[in-house]
């Protein structure tokens, strides 16, 4: 599971997800990628499940790039605990994703294999996504028109 080695502060506020992604909104490394169409939190378990789904489908052929990292701790209080007595302890880590963000990329395999692998990975993620190619997502602004 992905998580930071060290953090300056153990707990964070929830924050809000406004607007579109301004960075990471084009396919930079591979030939095809998964682009988020709505905002959301993606846990480290979901990232790992999507990575495994892609890796199993492309076998040893291509390469997978994970372009998001879960750096936000989500806290949880124990069950049947009374209100108050402070914020709960960190339970898991999430990556904050905005619309237009390319989360995974695949390269080194042919188009059918890459698209099927990414389709399997999309089913592991909690937000709406679409598969984009390097040509479609060349300019971040143009690719985000449908977002």
From Swiss-Prot:
Please give the GO cellular component terms listed in this UniProt entry: cytosolic large ribosomal subunit
Q: Listed GO molecular functions? A: rRNA binding; structural constituent of ribosome; tRNA binding
Keywords from the UniProt entry: Ribonucleoprotein, Ribosomal protein, RNA-binding, rRNA-binding, tRNA-binding
The UniProt entry's GO biological process terms, in alphabetical order, are: translation
Pfam families, per the entry: Ribosomal_L16
Which family does the similarity line name?
A: Belongs to the universal ribosomal protein uL16 family.
This molecule's function is given as: Binds 23S rRNA and is also seen to make contacts with the A and possibly P site tRNAs.
Quaternary assembly: Part of the 50S ribosomal subunit.
Query: What is the name listed in the Swiss-Prot or TrEMBL entry for this protein?
Result: Large ribosomal subunit protein uL16
Query: What gene name is given for the protein in this entry?
Result: rplP
């Amino acid at each position: 599971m992905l998580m930071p080695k060290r953090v300056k502060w153990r707990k964070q506020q929830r924050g809000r997800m406004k607007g579109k992604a301004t960075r990471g909104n084009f396919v930079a490394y591979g030939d095809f990628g998964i682009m988020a169409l709505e905002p959301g939190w993606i846990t480290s378990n979901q990232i790992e499940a999507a990575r495994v789904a892609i890796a199993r489908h492309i076998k040893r052929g291509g390469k997978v790039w994970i372009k998001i990292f879960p750096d936000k701790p989500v806290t949880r209080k124990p069950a049947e605990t009374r209100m108050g007595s402070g914020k709960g302890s960190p339970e898991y880590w999430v990556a904050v994703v905005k619309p237009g963000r390319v989360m995974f990329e695949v390269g080194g395999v042919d188009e059918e294999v890459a698209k099927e692998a990414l389709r399997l990975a999309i089913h592991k993620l909690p937000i709406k996504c679409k598969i984009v190619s390097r040509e479609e997502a060349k300019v971040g602004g143009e690719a985000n028109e449908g977002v």
